[in-house]
Amino acid sequence: MIKSVIAGAVAMAVVSFGVNNAAPTIPQGQGKVTFNGTVVDAPCSISQKSADQSIDFGQLSKSFLEAGGVSKPMDLDIELVNCDITAFKGGNGAKKGTVKLAFTGPIVNGHSDELDTNGGTGTAIVVQGAGKNVVFDGSEGDANTLKDGENVLHYTAVVKKSSAVGAAVTEGAFSAVANFNLTYQ
């Protein structure tokens, strides 16, 4: 009898051990992390928050815009980080240690300084830097002097009634996309 009890206990232990080993582990939460980036031959890096920005103007009064008003200016900062301007200026050629920005995007017909919006609201976006309207036709703006470390290129953006012939401000959502390119000198 004792031998059969011991044999039964050993058999149960073997079966239990085998079952526990075969049971899959169920995660108690999981996710995925994807890492991306681009290495560029430039004296500065563009901060992540500057490389892909979104500006929300909120709700704007139709009658205010129609009467020639403009929205509250919103900051549009382009942060350049980890700049090594000393080495850049000391490289081949006579380099000044400056950067020029060129903006592109759909423009209001005849008004390269107005970014046309989608949505049929009769609105446009105007971006200013150093007191001047930027153009969205790919032309480079004024040179910005850079220093080692971090540099912030400050712009502001406003919404206004489009200068297109016959434009009228209408209700609805609008959006616009502008791209920028940097040229170091």
UniProtKB/Swiss-Prot annotation:
GO cellular component terms attached to this protein's record: extracellular region; pilus
Main location: secreted
Domain of life, source organism: Bacteria
UniProt entry keywords in alphabetical sequence: Disulfide bond, Fimbrium, Secreted, Signal
Localization per record: Secreted; Fimbrium
Signal peptide: 1-22
GO BP terms, alphabetized: cell adhesion involved in single-species biofilm formation
Disulfide bonds: C44-C83
InterPro entries tied to this protein: Adhesion_dom_fimbrial, Adhesion_dom_fimbrial_sf, Adhesion_dom_sf, Bact_Fimbrial_Adh_Pro
Pfam families: Fimbrial
Function: Polymerizes to form the thick (6.8 nm in diameter) rod of the pilus (also called fimbria). The rod is a right-handed helical cylinder with 3.28 PapA subunits per turn. Pili are polar filaments radiating from the surface of the bacterium to a length of 0.5-1.5 micrometers and numbering 100-300 per cell, and enable bacteria to colonize the epithelium of specific host organs.
Family membership: Belongs to the fimbrial protein family.
Additional remarks: Strains of E.coli that cause infection of the human urinary tract produce pap-pili which are hair-like appendages consisting of about 1000 helically arranged subunits of the protein PapA. These pili mediate binding to digalactoside-containing glycolipids present on the epithelial cells which line the urinary tract.
The protein, known as: Pap fimbrial major pilin protein
